[in-house]
Amino acid sequence: DEKGEKISKSKGNGISIEQWLRYASPESLALYMYPNPKRAKKLYSEVVPKTVDEYLSFIEKYPNQKPSDKITNPVWHVHNGKPPKEKIVMPFSMLLNLVGSSNAENKKVLWKFINRFHKDIKSIDHPILDKLTEYAINYFKDKVEPNKKFKIPDDKEKLALKNLIKSLEKINQVDKPEEIQTIIYTVGKENGYSSNLREWFKLIYEVIFGEQDGPRMGFFVSFFGVKETISLINTKIK
């Protein structure tokens, strides 16, 4: 596990290989083992999303690398010299946040949101992403949802979040993620967080997602939907 102790299911201090394969692909596990395949590894649930996102990053880089660099890319070895050719649409961490925000019980619901932001893609053409939607739901239900701690904002924090809603109501659904991110920054600065914007985003994450960290909010709002994000915030500050 994360402390280097033998995994004990009864103690709940790690995950088994079988559990890993419920939450992520065999290729992600192979990547995790890749640096030192014979060495005992710390196997715990928190490392799964990070490893999956690293795997996706390597897949994304591979097509544009020089031949000499391709053979040093771990996915070249993981896939026996033939990595899949798939455009990476979003990180696994974003999918996890989407599962929580949308209350998705199945991948059809997730694909509905994916297609809102990427209208032209189909699950049949994106097998990696399609499988990731299943993994994300499994991981969220088992490892994320039981540990969520939603913050109840005080009056000052509620006012800041209400001002965020007012600003979101003025923007267009087609606004770019970077523009939305700037708007969220501005609201934070105007509501007492100018010297510590990290605390502003921490407030948003804890209230909306029940976690101290989360996705880049401009991208999330664009992806999840402006109206849906406003509704989500409203339900958390009532």
Located regions from the model:
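Catalytic adenosine-cofactor/nucleotide-binding cores of aminoacyl-tRNA synthetases and other
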Residues: D1-E134, F209-K238
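Basic, alpha-helical terminal appendages of large translation-related enzymes
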Residues: A104, W111-K238
